[in-house]
Amino acid sequence: KVSTEAGAAPGIYTISVTQLAQAQSLRTDSPTIIASTKDALGDESSDTRTIKITQDGRKEPLEIKLNKDQTSLDEISKAINDADSGISASIVKVKDGNYQLVLTASEGLANKMTISVEGDSKLNDLLAYDSKTNTGNMKELVNAQNAQLNVNGIDIERSSNKITDAPQ
């Protein structure tokens, strides 16, 4: 859908959208079925652990500290959502006794996620993912990409599907 707002540059434009921006989405892909959203998934011998999510568009990695009692899908999802970082976490019930964690970033290539967990090898085994090599223990459901369009013969690329500055 193409629309204009008050103050838009007057003119006649030929617009061709070749690619819509997408937000990367990852899900847990553990060979072990996660049977409950309340079961502890972390190493019980570790008191604290830190989930680190690195994105090219973020100056510093997002660090989410979890205590021993915060390693269930419910608690991990809550902690990520409470960080209010542009990354959302949800839990999907695949079927009775089988749950997965899904993480979704904001639109655009700069928001691709690389995830690691420090201080808890069990959680790292569940959540680790490298977006540069597309390897790890999460599975990519949706690949991040920027919007690409052509306006009057000019190729334009933006991280979002809302383009407010071309033409001006």
What do these predicted regions represent?
Residues 1-100, 104-168:
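Bacterial flagellar/type III secretion structural subunits and associated motility module proteins
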